[in-house]
Amino acid sequence: MDQKKFYITTPIYYPSDKLHIGHTYCTVATDAMARYKRLQGYNVKFLTGTDEHGQKIELKAKEAGVTPQQFVDNIVEGPKGVKDLWKLMNISYDRFIRTTDDYHVAAIQKIFKKMYEKGDIYKGKYVGKYCTPCESFWTESQLVNGCCPDCGRPVVDAEEEAYFFRLSKYADRVRDLLVNTDFLLPRSRVNEMVHNFIDPGLEDLCVSRTSFKWGIPVDFDPKHVVYVWIDALFNYTTALGFMNDKYPDSDYETFWPADVHFIGKEIVRFHSIIWPAMLMSMDMPLPKHVYGHGWLLLDGGKMSKSKGNVVDPYLLAERYSADALRYFLLRDFPFGSDGNFSNELLINRINMDLANDLGNLLSRTTAMADKYFGGNLPIEQDEGPEDAALLEKARGLRDRYEADMEAYAFQNALADVFEVIDNANKYIDATAPWVLAKSEDTKPRLARVLYNLAETLRICTVLLQPFMPTTCEKIFAQLNVEADGKTWDSAAAFGTLPANATLHKGENIFPRIDAAKELAELEALEAAQKAAAQAANAPAEEKEVKSAESGAASAELIGEHEEEITFDDFCKVELRVAEVRACERMKESKKLLHLTVFDGERERCILSGIAKWFAPEDLIGKKIGIVANLAPRPMMKGKYVSEGMIFAADTDVDGGCSIAFFPDSTPAGARIH
């Protein structure tokens, strides 16, 4: 019988900067699923990679003083780059694609031409709004408060000659796919796609650009570069040899369509609407599932490289082990929902589950076997009534685990395993091996208790392999498990270990962590890491710019105590609520933000020295407090005029900053008393 196949992918990540814990979360989940299917005996193909073209990369490379290719090479292949991170995290991908690979470039040109010749791509002119970070075009009606509906950042006016894909042609078929099949998971994502994007009317999609050069040229019209939709999405097929000779045709025939694409929920629209429509145009089979997982939140907000509010997976994996981090990511957060990340949660999970439960069970079992039998269990063993509950749980574990894994419910699958581990620890207390050891008459009973513990541990370890592969090999070594005891089939059979098993007392696989001490050290390490990164990325400012920044910072942030003023003097200050309508960084300064605010009567410009603490996109649409009757202040040698001051406060001795935000319901122009 032919071996069953399973093809799973991560998104291909955009290498504008080092990857963070959110990217690691998705990749670890994909790796766990791939390992699970291999454990079941499937022929698995696991693809990951990087999406390396686009205007943002071109701009980042220019800022860094290197070519775009050099820039992405460093992020992907350089020290602590993408590939190094996946090696550290023990990611078992079968194939890694870079969209700058020659075979992919050639294939994309063929795909673009085929869709053009079919009439599904045509030349026109794009006029509308464009979000550079998302590389997305939007109509006026799709904007939210004048900003990109995906990321909330400001958009710019764009007009250029472009090729378009007839997305509107496939609207009905895509709608039917989403509504009437389980193509998009979890199903809670379907209504958002249908009601927000399809039902209002799908417009044809811009699929080429002329305003930048870092991309794949359209071979029959080389002033155009192929836009991200075709370039990036078709990686899932070109990596299998589709329309190229890099890999054998049999790879595509064997593995396509994909069984599941794991993606972050922010790119569900691309994968559930644009991707199937393009495959329909190419008369290609559709993926079986697209699963849009939730975000890892930090302090209640989405992690973002551009915002700088990210967690470094290197620091955590090197400090606690890749397996501990892998386990935490998939144990603490339901895969389809958002979850709040914190170092405290990580350390508590390591202590509770890995040190107290799993590690303790292994060390107690092997230590007692060593102490009472020299590590060699006797073959004479007596069953007891206390055994039934544990054995029943252990024998039924694989079926419960399988049901959860097939639903991509990793949190539940791990909870099932650790419920049995918890039962095994309680079984030790119930059977009291130290009492049984006092009499030769109860030694056979003691041997059976230790065998039950070792065999329960073996079954649990088989099922933990997709999540903690290195740790599981250490446990197997201490339990002296042969290859046939590590298989999927063996997890359903209690009694695979020989009755006279030899157990080895080994290292403590997860030492307990001093939480208070560790959290303090982590905080210091992360602060030092962040400061070093900021210093490395901050070029020297011109003196005139620094002077302007210093003035803005001292006026808005320092707030030194001055001499007292009278009540009448204070009443002269006009304090009002204003809505931030636009905000951008300034080319002339790394510290100043240029805000356009509406004060209830007119828009005004305010320059504020808060760029170190706030990303522009985090302020747009917010209601803030301003000093509205401050005399206009020329800045940057008169190039700009700042027409007010925002409310900001020092938050710590290092010069942290917070801003007073007002509820959305507060009208712009409201007086502050």
Language-model-detected regions and their locations in the chain:
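Short secondary-structure capping/junction motifs at helix and strand boundaries
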Residues: 89-96, 116-129, 141-142, 156-158, ...
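Cys/His-rich short segments
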Residues: 118-171, 175
